[in-house]
Amino acid sequence: MVGPLSDRAIRRILKPLVFAASLSPVAFLIWDALTHQFNVNPFNAIVRSTGFWSLRFLCLTLAITPLRWLTGWHSVMKFRRMIGQFGFFYGTVHTAAYVLFDRLAGLDASVRARPLVATAHTLSAIGADLLRPFFAIGLVAFALMAPLAATSSVGMMRRLGGRRWQVLHRLVYPVAVASILHTYWPLTPRAPRYAVIIGMLFVLRLGRAYARRRASMARRVQATG
């Protein structure tokens, strides 16, 4: 069992440390760009790296509740929103990098000089990409992440009501599945490990839900007995 931490220690020490650690991938990307550590296609490296970091933070977000169950460390829940927001942040950077580097930067200079024409060409290219399942699934994952990030605050939880908020935030599981498929589709070697991690976390969730259901049924039997 992990002992409780004071709110002051979490707010002043641990949260800034977690925030800084969560931003470290950006610092490493900037460093690699400045020191020319990227391969022949640096833009592709940025797109891939931010995509994987979004998936990693998604895995961490899903792991927080099981970690609380297994360790009794309830204070860890205070970090879930921040980690989830970083998952959306890296997903946003991943999507923006794809649009800017893979699509907009690939246009002829004369086309880029005309904003409306460049926008039309870029949207046309994105529309063509969406006919490919790999891109379409990635867009679905990002679109589902947006309402989760927008409603992750305590204030939004109160506005929606606890039950509706919980139902909405179960979208994290379709997001996880879509993210794995988006990663796995191009046969990326690292994708299976994330599938295993998310699968194990999902099994833990199911086991916890089953145990709670049995406990609830047992209490009902005792109450009626």
Give the ranges of each region predicted by the language model.
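Membrane-embedded alpha-helical bundles that constitute the cytochrome b-like, heme-associated redox core
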Residues: 1-225
